[in-house]
Each structure stands twice: as C-alpha cells, then as structure tokens.
From Swiss-Prot:
The keyword Transmembrane helix does not apply. InterPro entries: YihI. Keywords: GTPase activation, Ribosome biogenesis. It comes from Actinobacillus succinogenes (strain ATCC 55618 / DSM 22257 / CCUG 43843 / 130Z). A GTPase-activating protein (GAP) that modifies Der/EngA GTPase function. May play a role in ribosome biogenesis. It comes from the Bacteria. Residues 1-84 are annotated as: Disordered. This is Der GTPase-activating protein YihI. Residues 9-24, 37-48 have a biased composition (Basic and acidic residues).
Amino acid sequence: MSRQKKSRRLTDVMPTRKADKKTEIGAVKARPGKKLTRYELDARAREEKRKRKHKGLDSGSRHSASSDSGKNQQTEVKDPRIGSRKKVPLVVEFVNKPEKGQFIQPIKTEKKPTALDPATELEQLENNECLNDLLDQLDAGKVLSKEDQVFVDECLARIAQLMDELGISDDEEGEDDLLRTFEKIDINQFR
C-alpha cells in the first residue's frame, strides 16, 4: 500500500508577491470550529504590527497642538497663588525689617537675676580655665593687656568677697606655726 499525498488547500498556498493579495484584518477571519492556517496567522500579525507601528501621534504634533492648548488655558481658572509677580530677594540683608507702614513692637525680655549659691559660684570661679591661664601668665612674669588685667582683678575681688561670705580664711600659716604643730603632735597617735 502506498501512501497517498495529501492535497493542499488553496488557502495554504502563499502568494508570490505582496501585491498579488492584499489582506485586511476583516478579510482574514477565523473559520468557525477550525484553526487558522499559518498564512492567515502571518497576515493577521502583519496587520497588527502595521497598526502598532503607527500608534503614536503625527509628526509635528507638538507644534500644531500648541494652538489648541492655548485656547484651553484661557478658559481654565488660574490659581492666584501660582506664578506670583512679587520679587524675591536673593540675598537677605535685613532680618525682621517691617514692611512699609507697619511697626513691630520690640519684645521686652526681663533679665532674670542669676543668683547662684555662693559656694557654687566660688567653685565656678576657681575652676575657670581662662582665669587660671591668666594667673599662670602673671606668675611667669608676663604682662597682661588692660582688659585681661581688669578681668583678673574683678574675678579675684569676687573670690575674696565670696570667701568672706562663706567664712573661709585664706591666711597662710607661717613656718613657725607649722613647727609648733609638728612638735605638739603625738607620734603614738598614728601607730
């Protein structure tokens, strides 16, 4: 038994040139209950590609559409907050300067008296690094400027005043007093 060759359908045969058969999307229809042939699928794909290729706007639409958009902009209500014509200074020269015809009342600030405890104030003055540096310079024999000398004098006067208030004496004991206390000490106390 020999095999018989299947006969081809006429729709399966592709045209030799494009000009021979122009297909439109409507022309390539699916037959009910049957699959599309390769030729019909190719024709449909070509047409869809041609559609996709021309999907965008026409060339030069940017220029031609501007006249239409200009008409639309006139009808729209503009927000007055957008596009202010008031000039904005690039460099701020005066801070809190009142505008013309306005007066800004100064805020009254009450100076709170900072009454520290005399012991704390004395401790702060003794731990003042600037004062200690200036006193070290004086001990080294250097001459201070007028402002530095005034600062040192004021601080030392305040320290003396606070020591009087607290009852602290700055009297240094003489060598004779030290010898007397040394002689009076009983050595047996420390054993």
